[in-house]
Amino acid sequence: MPDSPFGDWDGTPAGARLLQQELAGRVVLRDDFPDLGLIAGVDVGFEEGGGITRAAAVLLDANTLGVLAESLVRIPTSMPYIPGLLSFRELPAVLRALAELPRVPDLVFCDGQGIAHPRRLGIAAHLGVVSGLPTIGVAKKILVGTHAELGSHRGDQVPLMYRGEVLGAVLRSKDRVRPLIVSPGHRVSLASAPRLVMACVTRYRLPEPTRLADRLASRRA
């Protein structure tokens, strides 16, 4: 894992937006991942009024969805919440949590956006570019874009459109539940991202990697 996900960023919001534009140009939107043996989910929570960032990573068997390992790290939060710059607040802890897993996953599911972002660099895309890992963003809400009416059944999906471009899919993971916003992060195609998410959905609305990471990240010591 990289020492820093931010390169020579000057620490300002304006500089962060410029870096997002640069890194977005490195995103690979084609399937470039191995046969999946290990997958991971990552999510972030906060403690002490946002002063501590708590990141969880869960490693699973891609075939059985059984949990193989998990890690939870807590570090001081280094940046306030700024819309559109979430990865600058969360990635340092996420990278440490992934580094503490005993093995490197073949694919990482992130609780958050992939390219479905104003500058095409949500946390999943940012993580993928700086780590080199294939990533998918699985968000609970739309950050940008619009979509056509969505069917009510499991597996129904429609494109998420933004400024004439498809940035992801609005996906119904279970019958008559609120949809997920699925977008590729890095080294995963627009077509494959929803399929890979659905392969990890069991009894719950969220796919197992992010559901389990969310549960771990929400757990306080």
UniProtKB/Swiss-Prot annotation:
Its EC number is 3.1.21.7. It catalyses: Endonucleolytic cleavage at apurinic or apyrimidinic sites to products with a 5'-phosphate. It is found in: Cytoplasm. The record marks Y81 as: Interaction with target DNA. GO terms for molecular function: deoxyribonuclease V activity; magnesium ion binding; RNA endonuclease activity, producing 5'-phosphomonoesters; single-stranded RNA binding. Keywords: Cytoplasm, DNA damage, DNA repair, Endonuclease, Hydrolase, Magnesium, Metal-binding, Nuclease. PANTHER family: ENDONUCLEASE V. DNA repair enzyme involved in the repair of deaminated bases. Selectively cleaves double-stranded DNA at the second phosphodiester bond 3' to a deoxyinosine leaving behind the intact lesion on the nicked DNA. HAMAP family: Endonuclease_5 (MF_00801). This is Endonuclease V. It comes from Azotobacter vinelandii (strain DJ / ATCC BAA-1303). The gene is nfi.
